[in-house]
Amino acid sequence: MSCSIFKDLPEDHPRRLIPALCRQFYHLGWVTGTGGGMSIKLNNEIYIAPSGVQKERMQPEDLFVQDIDGKDLQMPPEIRELKKSQCTPLFMLAYRHRNAGAVIHTHSQHAVMATLLWPGKTFRCTHLEMIKGVYDDADKRYLQYDEQLVVPIIENTPHERDLADSMYAGHDGASRLQCRSGQTPRSECSDYLFSIAVEMKMAGLDPETFVDASKA
């Protein structure tokens, strides 16, 4: 870590946690190059990663801080010439309408492949163990192994801000798949499920259907 004025903050403070997670996500292949984004809400402060920065090199002082109304509270040093994440309008939707505590935008290859292999506007899978790690916000509970996970797929746009209406429209789940881009997820369980479901599709299996081998 650099000699930052924020070095004495606890490790779980957003100024330290966001750079640490972005480095982890970079090594997982979720935020390669300058792609992807992340934000964490702490009390009345919303911490937002900058745009156009290599995620594995991000520092605590690089973050933007604003309130729920969009008023800037703290900015990165001017010499860094940083811009706030283009995902900011989408982050704010989650905070204002879903009472989210954090939002992550990944460019997972598994999520991208899922948008290409699933026709229509939804990704679906069932009877996969990690479904139990996905929280159903509508029912306020975790899904069961034998239930169906449904994730909307929305069309990509040239600019992130133009996705706001599609992100907001008509779904109570925690994630969205952005066609040919990635996901705004409960990340690890979702990424695992996309990976397994894509492999099942490519092997000629149907992730949306359960086949009881004992009755075959």
UniProtKB/Swiss-Prot annotation:
InterPro entries xref list: Aldolase_II/adducin_N, Aldolase_II/adducin_N_sf, MethylthioRu-1-P_deHdtase_MtnB, Salvage_MtnB_euk
Record pathway: Amino-acid biosynthesis; L-methionine biosynthesis via salvage pathway; L-methionine from S-methyl-5-thio-alpha-D-ribose 1-phosphate: step 2/6
UniProt KW Iron-sulfur keyword: no
GO molecular function, one term: zinc ion binding
GO cellular component: cytoplasm
Cofactors that this protein relies on: Zn(2+)
Cofactor binding note: Binds 1 zinc ion per subunit.
Keyword Amino-acid biosynthesis: yes
Keyword tags: Amino-acid biosynthesis, Cytoplasm, Lyase, Metal-binding, Methionine biosynthesis, Zinc
Sequence positions that bind substrate: 87
Annotated family: Belongs to the aldolase class II family. MtnB subfamily.
Reported function: Catalyzes the dehydration of methylthioribulose-1-phosphate (MTRu-1-P) into 2,3-diketo-5-methylthiopentyl-1-phosphate (DK-MTP-1-P).
HAMAP family associated with the record: Salvage_MtnB_euk (MF_03116)
NCBIfam families: salvage_mtnB (TIGR03328)
Name assigned to this protein: Probable methylthioribulose-1-phosphate dehydratase
